[in-house]
Amino acid sequence: TNRIKKKLTPKLSIMFFLGGFQGLLGWYMVKSGLVNIPSVSQYRLTAHLGNAVIIYGYMLWVAFGLLEDSKQSLMTSASNITKGIRVSSYAITGLLFFMILSGGLVAGTRAGLAYSTFPLMGETFIPVGLYSSSPFWLSAFEDITTIQFNHRMFAYFLFVLIFSFSIYTIRKLDSSIIRS
C-alpha cells in the first residue's frame, strides 16, 4: 500500500542490518562468558555498546531527517550562522561516542570498583601504577587503574569542552539575533 516512502527504504534496510549485527555481537559477547570464567570480554562488551549507540544515533538521524523535510525553509535561513556550530557539535558528538566506549571498558573490566572515591583515586588525583602494563599502550585497554583514570580525564575534558561550547554558542546566536 506504499505507506513507506521509497527514499526511506534504504535507511530502514540499514537499520535492519545494524539490528541484526547487534544481535550477532550480543551472541558473540555472551559466548565469551560461557567458558571457565562467567564474565564477558571488555572488548566485546564495548563493541556491543558502541554498536547500540550507533543504532540509536542512526535512528535519531533518520527521524530528524523526516522532520527536517517539513522545516527546510527554517534551516536555510539559519545555515550561515550555525555552520560552525553544527560542525563543532558533530565533533563533540564523536567525542561523546568515545567517552561511552571508554565507559564500556570501565564496565567490562569492573574498573569502577577499584577506586570508589571521587575526585581522588584512592588518596591521590593521579594514581600510582598508571600505564604500568607492558606494552605501555595496552594499559589503556586492560589495566583497571589506567582505564578508570582515562575515563575520568575524558569526562573532565568533555565537561570543559561542552561548557565552553555552550557559552560560545549562546554568544554567537545572541550576537546574530542582535545584528538582524
Where on the chain are the PLM-derived regions?
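Polytopic transmembrane helical bundles with strong interfacial aromatic enrichment
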Residues: T1-S180
